[in-house]
């Protein structure tokens, strides 16, 4: 095959590098330069300043950061709890039954987030479960959107745990609850932490559904960035974008490091 030849590997490396630079590095570099610019009327900024980052860490922008972290952690932890429960429950069924029941969790990931937001807005704007104008409606939307990815990660980890380990514990007289607490969950913990990292990053960057349903006082960072750029305040929006990217990456790196450490035990 071409990819196994030295020229093929070199060509693949060049293509991958070009795609990375064009579609990831350059846009991020432009956003960073914009966040530091005093004025940008030509090819390059005419001056640099940190005032946009100062604005991003004060007032409404700071509140948006706290709101994003609160919503992200709450929705991700609840999605993790439900994902673990669902993965453990589905393991009792056959392969075909697992496949069809898993689609219940995977379905929201196939629906545009705007459609999810609209559906939740209509469903919970009246009646006994009215949540419109509250934090709960945002948490519900984020949970629906990230639950599929959490369930997928946990299911993958659970599939890699040998059934023989639990069978040995059972043969030694361990109860189902003891096996779950002292055997299954400790072995599953690295995938649970990885699932938490993925769902948290997805929640932190969610815009489509949130912009339709967020209540006053719970503006998230993506919504704040959208509002700033929509008003033409590109530099402050760029600074807030860099803050969002940096915090999300730091959280993911920390959680993945924890997951790796747990996997080595």
From Swiss-Prot:
Key words, A-Z: Cell inner membrane, Cell membrane, Membrane, Transmembrane, Transmembrane helix, Transport
One Pfam family matching this protein: BPD_transp_1
An example Gene Ontology CC term for this record: plasma membrane
InterPro entries per record: AminoethylPonate_ABC_PhnV, MetI-like, MetI-like_sf
Cell location: Cell inner membrane
Single biological process term from Gene Ontology: transmembrane transport
PROSITE patterns on file: ABC_TM1
Chief location bin: membrane
Annotated ABC transmembrane type-1 domain residues: 65-253
PANTHER family hit by this protein: INNER MEMBRANE ABC TRANSPORTER PERMEASE PROTEIN YDCV (PTHR43357:SF4)
Family, per entry: Belongs to the binding-protein-dependent transport system permease family.
Protein name, as recorded: Putative 2-aminoethylphosphonate transport system permease protein PhnV
Organism: Salmonella paratyphi A (strain ATCC 9150 / SARB42)
């Amino acid at each position: 095959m071409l990819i196994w030849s030295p020229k093929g590997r070199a060509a693949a490396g060049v293509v991958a590098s070009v795609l990375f630079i064009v579609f990831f590095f350059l846009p991020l570099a432009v956003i960073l330069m914009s966040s530091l610019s005093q004025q940008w009327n030509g090819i390059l900024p005419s001056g640099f300043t940190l005032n946009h980052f100062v604005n991003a860490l004060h007032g409404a922008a700071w509140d948006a950061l706290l709101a994003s972290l609160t919503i992200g952690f709450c929705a991700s932890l609840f999605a993790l709890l439900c994902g673990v429960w669902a993965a453990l429950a589905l393991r009792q069924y056959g392969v075909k039954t697992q496949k069809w029941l898993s689609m219940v969790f995977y379905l929201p990931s196939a629906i545009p987030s705007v459609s999810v937001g609209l559906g939740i807005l209509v469903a919970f704007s009246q009646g006994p479960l009215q949540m419109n104008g509250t934090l709960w409606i945002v948490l519900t939307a984020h949970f629906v959107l990230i639950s599929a990815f959490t369930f997928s990660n946990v299911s993958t980890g659970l599939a890699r745990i040998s059934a023989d380990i639990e069978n040995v514990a059972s043969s030694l007289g361990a109860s189902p609850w003891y096996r779950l607490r002292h055997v299954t969950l400790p072995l599953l913990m690295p995938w649970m932490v990885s699932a938490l990292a993925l769902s948290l990053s997805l929640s932190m960057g969610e815009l489509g559904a949130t912009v339709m349903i967020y209540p006053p006082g719970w503006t998230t960072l993506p919504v704040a960035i959208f509002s700033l750029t929509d008003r033409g305040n590109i530099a402050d929006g760029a600074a807030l974008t860099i803050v969002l990217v940096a915090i999300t990456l730091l959280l993911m790196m920390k959680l993945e490091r924890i997951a790796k450490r747990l996997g080595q035990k």
